[in-house]
Each structure stands twice: as structure tokens, then as C-alpha cells.
UniProtKB/Swiss-Prot annotation:
Belongs to the LarC family. This is Putative nickel insertion protein. Signal peptide: none annotated. The keyword Nucleotide-binding does not apply. Pfam families: Ni_insertion (PF01969). It comes from Enterococcus faecalis (strain ATCC 700802 / V583). InterPro entries: Ni_insertion.
Length: 326
């Protein structure tokens, strides 16, 4: 059972064009990765993991559900794989397995390893599906969580072995607001006894937990001590949540709060297909005005993979984007 056979089954089915397209893309990506690992052509690759009926159901079923849920954009924190080795049909393999590493090429997927877990957490099938979703590794600006679900693994890893997903609607503060105006909470604190590396960790942590923005400002305190003014922007509803995070992960013993009015442009994303992979384009609207910006992470990936400069990638993407607009 090779990629062409599986894709033929999908194409002849009564599935929607949406489900057919994404399901076939996943099977093709897996076949391409396996072919590269085994130094064969795609047509000669006979699936092991994905050849089973249950795996076909997993992949096709996922995209049926995705279509029914009408999900517009996927956001993700970095995904975690284990470490060590695993025994599969081809023998003992390192973790991440070769097919997973091959699938990571041409992507901006962020995968971290937990060296305390000595088993595989990221499979080729799982990563191929995840790759097809074109996830953004940034926190959505504001959101109202509607549902939360968990998928539990059977392996005993010694840790919480589950994948958590949530469905949310991008929204603004629950306070009444006009079309483009709302309120945000600014949290500030002065820090003069933590290293840049420690503060960098704090910034990443706050953004991962949903802060609207985090930034540092160099300041001089009394006795001319150099320090950093740490500023966090969030919603008024999350005041206590971020207060606790800051007390826990920084050396501060106090902070200041200020509620502020702001004007924002409506935001959406589109995916631009390029010869070098997918690139996210951020679209911002305000009373007939339109501003578009190119996702930096996607350009960085292309620049590194194809030995371009960032400027060259930006120009290329901008040219292709202008053609789609025209």
C-alpha cells in the first residue's frame, strides 16, 4: 500500500474537497519523508505506520472534524518529544526518529526535547498532521475559550502524558467596547537583580501564557543603579493570573497597574503558497484601511533552508503577495 494507492482511495470517496486535499497532503508528506530516509522514490515506499486502516481513519477523521469545527487558525506552544532510542520495524532508532526529523525540514515547527522521558512522544503521523495545520507559535491576542479537550497516551512516561487542545474565539475585553476600541491592563515592575537570560525566559513564559505584549525598558534607579522596567500588557480579567506569574518567576516584590484605553485594527491571517513553502500574512483592517505584514518566522525558515538573506525572502514574498492581490 503506497502513497498513490492511499490517495486514490481518498479521491474516490465521498469526502469533501477540503478533507481530501489535507488528508492527501499528510500522506504525501509522510511518504516523502520515508523516501528520503530510505533513499527510495515515493512510489516504492510502502507505509508501515500509516498503511493500517486505523491510521487512515485517524488522518481522514481528523480533517473531517477540523472542517466541521470551522477552525480558522491554529495556535500552538512548542511541542515536546522524548529522548533516547526506540525499537521499530527497522531496528533501534534515535529519538526523534529519522522520519520526524525529515518532516521538520521546510517548516518553522518548534519541537523541544524532554530528556527525562525516555520514549517517543512525536510520531511521523502526528507531526505530519500538525505540519499541515500551519500553526502559529504565538499567543492569540485575546480569546474567549469555549471548549477544552484532552487526548491521553497509554505509555507511562512519569509525567502528564496528554495533548490538550482548546477551541476559542478571538475577542476583546468583556467590558463594553466600540468596534475598534477596548481596554487593556498595563503591569509594570522594576528589576535590578536578574540576568538577561533569566529575563528572556520570563518574557517567553509570559507570552506563552497569553500576554498581549511584553517588553523591557532600560532605566536608572536611585543610587544610579541600572535596572530593567518590565512591562506586561494583558486584559483586566487576567490581572491576578499574571500577578502570580510575575511574583513566582521574577525577583520583584511589588508591581504597578494601570488600565488603559486602546484602539486596535481587526486582525486576520491568510496563508500564501510560495515555491519555498507556506508563509503567513497578517491582515489588519480599520475603517477601510488595510495593512499587511509578513510573518517573520516563516521568512527566517526559508532564508536558512535556501541560503537566502531575510531581505531577499521578504521581497520575494511581497512580490508573490502583490500578485495574489492583483
Amino acid at each position: 500500500m503506497n502513497d498513490r494507492f492511499v490517495c486514490s482511495l481518498i479521491e474516490k470517496s465521498d469526502l469533501s474537497n477540503f478533507v481530501k486535499k489535507h488528508s492527501k497532503n499528510v500522506f504525501y508528506d509522510i511518504a516523502k519523508a520515508e523516501a528520503a530516509v530510505h533513499q527510495q522514490t515515493i512510489d516504492t515506499i510502502h507505509f508501515h505506520e500509516v498503511g493500517a486502516i486505523d491510521s487512515i481513519v485517524d488522518i481522514v477523521g481528523f480533517f473531517i472534524l477540523w472542517e466541521q469545527l470551522e477552525i480558522e487558525q491554529v495556535y500552538s506552544t512548542p511541542i515536546t518529544d522524548g529522548s533516547g532510542t526506540i525499537t521499530i520495524a527497522h531496528g533501534v532508532m534515535p529519538i526523534p526518529v529519522p522520519a520526524v526529523m525529515e518532516l521538520r525540514k521546510e517548516t518553522n515547527l518548534i519541537i523541544q526535547q524532554d530528556f527525562e522521558i525516555k520514549t517517543e512522544l512525536v510520531t511521523p503521523t502526528g507531526l505530519a498532521i500538525f505540519k499541515e495545520l500551519s500553526p502559529l507559535f504565538v499567543a492569540p491576542e485575546q480569546r474567549l475559550i469555549e471548549k477544552i479537550g484532552y487526548g491521553f497516551g497509554k505509555r507511562e512516561t512519569g509525567k502528564f502524558n496528554a495533548l490538550r487542545g482548546s477551541i476559542f474565539t478571538e475577542t476583546h475585553s468583556k467590558k463594553k467596547r466600540t468596534e475598534h476600541h477596548d481596554q487593556v491592563l498595563k503591569i509594570e515592575t522594576n528589576i535590578d537583580n536578574q540576568t538577561p537570560e533569566q529575563l528572556g525566559y520570563v518574557m517567553d513564559l509570559l507570552l506563552e501564557h497569553g500576554a498581549l505584549d511584553v517588553f523591557f525598558t532600560p532605566i536608572h534607579m536611585k543610587k544610579n543603579r541600572s535596572a530593567i522596567l518590565l512591562t506586561v500588557l494583558t486584559t483586566t480579567e487576567e490581572k491576578e493570573y499574571f500577578t502570580e506569574l510575575l511574583f513566582k518567576h521574577t525577583s520583584t516584590i511589588g508591581m504597578r497597574f494601570q488600565t488603559m484605553e486602546r484602539s486596535v485594527m481587526d486582525r486576520s491571517f491568510k496563508i500564501l503558497e510560495t515555491p519555498f513553502g507556506k508563509v503567513h500574512i497578517k491582515k489588519n483592517h480599520y475603517h477601510g484601511l488595510l495593512k499587511e505584514s509578513i510573518e517573520y518566522q516563516d521568512c527566517e525558515r526559508i532564508a536558512k533552508q535556501y541560503n537566502f538573506t531575510i531581505e531577499e525572502v521578504y521581497r520575494l514574498v511581497q512580490t508573490l503577495n502583490n500578485k495574489t492581490i492583483d
